[in-house]
C-alpha cells in the first residue's frame, strides 16, 4: 500500500480541533515522498522554475486532505492566511486561489510577504481555520 501521508517537519500537528473550530497549520506543496509540487528543474546546472500556481493548487489539495481527517472540507474554511515569498507572484497565486474560493462566498483572507519559507523551493505556504460542528 502506498503511503501518501505527509508528516509534519516540526513539533506541531497538521490540525488542531478546538470545539467546532479546526486550525490547519501552515501547509506547503510538499508531497509524501518529500518533493514539492511546482518545482521544475530546467537545466543540468540545477536551475529551477518555481510555479506559484502549481504550488498553490497543491497546497489547497494538502489542506483538503488535512481537513478530511477532521471530517471537514474546504467549504468549511472561514479564514485563510497566505504567506508569499515574492509579491510578484500575487497574480498567479490569486488566479489559482480563485479556482476554488471566490470573493462572494469564500473565506476571509490575509496575504502577506515573508522573507523565506522552510525550504528554498517553496514560494507559498497557507494556514486556514475552518468551522465544522462536531
Question: What feature does the model see in each segment?
Answer:
Residues 1-61, 65-78, 84-134:
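N-terminal presequence-like segments and the immediate start of the first folded domain
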Amino acid at each position: 500500500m502506498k503511503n501518501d501521508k505527509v508528516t509534519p517537519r516540526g513539533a506541531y500537528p497538521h490540525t488542531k480541533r478546538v470545539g467546532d473550530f479546526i486550525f490547519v497549520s501552515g501547509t506547503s506543496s510538499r508531497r509524501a515522498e518529500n518533493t514539492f509540487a511546482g518545482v521544475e528543474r530546467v537545466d543540468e546546472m540545477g536551475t529551477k522554475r518555481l510555479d506559484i500556481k502549481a504550488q498553490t493548487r497543491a497546497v489547497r489539495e494538502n489542506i483538503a486532505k488535512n481537513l478530511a481527517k477532521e471530517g471537514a472540507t474546504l467549504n468549511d474554511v472561514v479564514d485563510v492566511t497566505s504567506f508569499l515569498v515574492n509579491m510578484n507572484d500575487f497574480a498567479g497565486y490569486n488566479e489559482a486561489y480563485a479556482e476554488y474560493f471566490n470573493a462572494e462566498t469564500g473565506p476571509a483572507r490575509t496575504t502577506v510577504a515573508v522573507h523565506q519559507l522552510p525550504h528554498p523551493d517553496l514560494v507559498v505556504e497557507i494556514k486556514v481555520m475552518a468551522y465544522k460542528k462536531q
